[in-house]
């Protein structure tokens, strides 16, 4: 099989809920990320063989969101496009499917990533059969199709509370983790550690010039001193709060994948090699710990031991996700999410799987490290993981 390399990878800033990116539909955000990834290496869009983009709550975005993103980015109409929905792991699964296409010889150049605008997710009302008596009920599309377990109809946070109880993580443990995430992301931005991965977004305004969004918005919204005083968000006696959980966000990320041969032919320097990847799943209510199942599978496929991995990125759907998976895998937080994670940076559902991979690539570069692993849980009890080697 062909070796798969990453030659370009960028993301938009992550916008807060109803924040700076809230008026930009997901396909438009995806287009900005795709165009940015292509421009970074001066790659002709006509050379792209396929586009695969993750997008979770697609209601209201129009037909074929990935196709829209590709066309808006200047990709020719002749290039096939696919939209992936693996809930929070959608962006990572898109990269995995792109890598598979290249490895098997079905493509030489694939753009893969993810996108989400949670601010624009609509409410639903069942009007096909009419309401014979009484009021109709509006259903929040974000809640129904993004943030609630389909089997027991509990919010994802209820599962996080159960995880904290099972693995003995206190409210204080989770708050400390959240504070560390905010501290790390703030310091990383101050040190310019996100400059290479984030591209600006010009947001059209009703009047005047577009507003430029150049930085993640979420990490500046917190009041650290208030974190210990927040009420439980999901269960009466729970320990998960709005502050130690990830937030509702908008954003997009895109990577350009190539076969090693094609990168050499085009004189493009690979940034990283995809060494292996894997999915795993168990009971839906324990989705929080599924990364601890997916990561060992990806490592085994890569013939790499966990001790050889120098830096890890776990998607912080909740603080307890980071804590529990570190505990299960025997990891220290010294090399996990060193530039902060989704608790502080934000979690645009379809984007996050690609976002953590892009962040990992930059962390490896910044620390002159070689091997990294990224893993992300997803609703329904699943997870995905990727192992990369910096070139």
Task: Please state what every model-predicted region is.
Residues 1-61, 65-69, 73, 77-80, ...:
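Conserved active-site "lid/cap" helical segment
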Residues 55-109, 150-155, 221-247, 328-355, ...:
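Conserved catalytic cysteine-centered active-site region
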Residues 84-116, 164-193, 254-261, 326, ...:
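Active-site-proximal alpha-helical scaffold in enzymes
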Residues 1-24, 223-287, 293, 300, ...:
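Condensing-enzyme catalytic core mediating Claisen C-C bond formation in acyl metabolism
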Residues 158-161, 197, 205, 275-344:
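Active-site pocket-lining segment
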Residues 11-12, 23-32, 40, 173-265, ...:
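N-terminal extracellular/periplasmic Venus flytrap/periplasmic-binding protein-like
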Residues 109-162:
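Flexible glycine-/small-residue-enriched beta->alpha junction loops
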């Amino acid at each position: 099989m062909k070796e798969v390399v990453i030659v370009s990878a960028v993301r938009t800033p992550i916008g807060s809920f109803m924040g700076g990116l809230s008026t930009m539909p997901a396909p438009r955000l995806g287009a900005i990320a795709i165009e940015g990834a292509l421009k970074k290496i001066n790659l002709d869009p006509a050379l792209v063989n396929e586009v695969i983009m993750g997008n979770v709550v697609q209601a209201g975005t129009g037909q074929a969101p990935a196709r829209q993103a590709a066309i808006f980015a200047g990709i020719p109409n002749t290039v096939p496009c696919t939209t992936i929905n693996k809930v929070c792991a959608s962006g990572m699964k898109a990269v995995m499917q792109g890598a598979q296409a290249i490895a098997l010889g079905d493509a030489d150049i694939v753009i893969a990533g993810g996108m989400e605008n949670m601010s624009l997710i609509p409410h639903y009302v069942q009007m096909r059969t009419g309401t014979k008596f009484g009021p109709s009920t509006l259903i929040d599309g974000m809640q129904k199709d993004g943030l609630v377990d389909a089997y027991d109809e509990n919010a994802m946070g209820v599962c996080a509370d159960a995880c904290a109880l099972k693995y003995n993580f206190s409210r204080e443990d989770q708050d400390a983790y959240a504070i560390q995430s905010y501290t790390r992301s703030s310091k990383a931005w101050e040190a310019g550690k996100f400059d290479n991965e984030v591209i600006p977004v010009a947001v059209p305004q009703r009047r005047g010039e577009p507003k430029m969004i150049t930085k993640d918005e979420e990490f500046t919204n917190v009041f650290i001193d208030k974190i210990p005083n927040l009420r439980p968000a999901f269960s009466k006696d729970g320990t998960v709060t709005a502050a130690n959980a990830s937030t509702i966000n908008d954003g997009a990320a895109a990577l350009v994948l190539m076969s090693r041969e094609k990168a050499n032919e085009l004189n493009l320097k690979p940034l990283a090699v995809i060494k292996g990847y894997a999915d795993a799943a168990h009971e839906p209510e324990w989705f929080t710990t599924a990364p601890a199942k997916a990561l060992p599978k990806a490592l085994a496929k890569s013939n790499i031991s966990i001790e050889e991995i120098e830096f890890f990125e776990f998607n912080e759907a909740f603080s307890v996700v980071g804590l529990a998976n570190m505990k299960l895998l025997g990891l220290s937080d010294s090399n996990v999410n060193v530039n902060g994670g989704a608790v502080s940076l934000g979690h645009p559902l379809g984007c996050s799987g690609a976002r953590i991979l892009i962040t990992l690539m930059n962390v490896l570069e910044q620390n002159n490290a070689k091997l990294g692993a990224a893993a992300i849980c997803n609703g329904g009890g699943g997870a995905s993981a990727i192992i990369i080697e910096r070139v």
